[in-house]
Amino acid sequence: MAKDAEDFKTSYESLWTELRILYEYDQISENMLLNPIRRIIETFTKFNALDKTTFCNKVSGAKKLFDVNSHSIDDIEAELNGKTKQEIIQMFYDCFEKNEYGTHFFKYWGNAHVDENGNLVMSSEES
């Protein structure tokens, strides 16, 4: 059991690390963030016995955006609707925050904070 928990922790942390790296590199397109986000949400909701749809539906457009390319690659560009990496990560954060798991997001994301308007602000320091 302890080995399974350790494997889960390592895999889950790796998803967050992957997401942060993809976010930070300018050469990486916005759509590359969606797969690790979807995998993080699926893992998090399953591990915590939460309904994934309910978790995402508290943020307008999140479920649709984060499900893009989960079954087909054809619609990915059309579905982004011009969202920036910052807007995508904001939606991702909002899903955690609106489900009362904002501290969980910060534990894994690293250096960031929320401004007085509820916007996620990234730190310029390495995490």
Residue ranges and their predicted role:
Residues M1-S127:
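Acidic, Mg2+-coordinating catalytic modules of nucleic-acid enzymes
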